[in-house]
A protein has these predicted regions:
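Active-site metal-binding loops of divalent metal-dependent hydrolases
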Residues: 12, 136, 165
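Short beta-strand/loop segments at the ligand-binding rim of alpha/beta enzyme cores
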Residues: 158-165
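Structural motif
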Residues: 7-8, 130-132, 162, 193, ...
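Conserved N-terminal subdomain of the carbohydrate kinase-like
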Residues: 50-133
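Anion (oxyanion) recognition and catalysis
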Residues: 45, 71, 152-156, 186
């Protein structure tokens, strides 16, 4: 493998998004590729970067379709594992009257949650310029421990770690548990991407600037993006 500009680690799943109502009056959903880290890999590839994706999907119609989408998007999938035991994670997206999204996940024993560190071909990190991940893989299963181990591996190699909080509380046992593990991840983060809502979840402050300054003073990021 040639050295990659960006290696993304995390969830690759199917988003079923609403596209209207059928003739029978039932909601119609469209199957779309999803998963924040996979989206980053695809977007970076479109900009001309060399990218690779580390993850796990089911060896099913969804997982094979997702792998094909990454390949067509010029994302290296040598470190994307296909599981014969676990199924690809599915998410159904609902939009409220303001257009804001909410998610219903079908992820119990999903393939992405069962990714083990020893399954990953670490050669994908050789010469890598940036490593990207998010908190979704930390919510449950084997992938929680794997997330921290791969972040530490990247840092050991001198690779800057980019972390997207991407908080999905309905995937976690509790908000307190989510905050605990996300704060652990921040200790391994060089570049942080966080929404305003996530920022106030992690840091108190009268406004965004104050909350961001407090969080940055605690972890000393190279960059903090809100």
């Amino acid at each position: 493998m040639s050295p990659f500009d960006v290696v993304s680690f995390g969830e690759l799943l199917v988003d079923f998004t609403p596209v209207g109502i059928s003739e029978n009056g039932n909601p119609v959903f469209e199957r779309n590729p999803g998963g924040g880290p996979a989206n980053v890999a695809c977007a970076a590839a479109k900009l001309g970067a060399g990218t690779a994706f580390i993850g796990k999907v089911g060896n099913d119609i969804f997982g094979n379709a997702l792998r094909g989408i990454l390949n067509r998007g010029k994302v290296n999938t040598d470190a994307l594992l296909l599981s014969d035991t676990y199924k690809t994670t599915l998410a159904f997206v609902q939009l409220d009257s303001f257009g804001d999204r909410s998610f219903s996940f079908y992820r119990k024993n999903g393939a992405d949650t069962m990714l083990e560190f020893d399954e990953i071909p670490l050669s994908v990190l050789d010469g890598c310029r940036y490593f990207f991940c998010s908190s979704v893989m930390m919510a449950e299963g084997e992938s929680r421990g794997t997330s921290f181990r791969i972040m530490k591996e990247a840092r050991k190699r001198g690779i800057p770690v980019m972390f997207d909080v991407n908080l999905r509380l309905n995937l976690w046992e509790s908000a307190a548990l989510a905050k605990k593990y996300i704060e652990e991840a921040l200790c391994l983060t060089d570049i942080l991407k966080v929404s305003e809502e996530e920022l106030f979840f992690l840091s108190d402050g009268a406004d965004v600037s104050e909350a961001a300054a407090k969080l940055n003073s605690q972890y000393n990021f190279k960059a903090l993006l809100v």
